[in-house]
């Protein structure tokens, strides 16, 4: 299980729950990261990134 949230997740990465349900795409640019709360979205189990 990873610890992240949609705000802090990287653009181009999709985040999924443990049962494979799509939750969100990340909103943070790795070169210019968002200021995000550091909480873990407990629904997010894994990510798949396109690059």
Curated annotation (Swiss-Prot):
InterPro entries: Prot_inh_I20 (IPR003465), Protease_inhibitor_I20 (IPR051391). It comes from Solanum tuberosum. It comes from the Eukaryota. GO terms for molecular function: serine-type endopeptidase inhibitor activity. SUPFAM superfamilies: Plant proteinase inhibitors. Disulfide bonds join 3-40, 6-24, 7-36, 13-49. This is Proteinase inhibitor PTI. Belongs to the protease inhibitor I20 (potato type II proteinase inhibitor) family. Keywords: Disulfide bond, Protease inhibitor, Secreted, Serine protease inhibitor. It is found in: Secreted. Its main location: secreted. GO terms for cellular component: extracellular region. The keyword Transport does not apply. The keyword Secreted applies. The record marks 38-39 as: Reactive bond for trypsin.
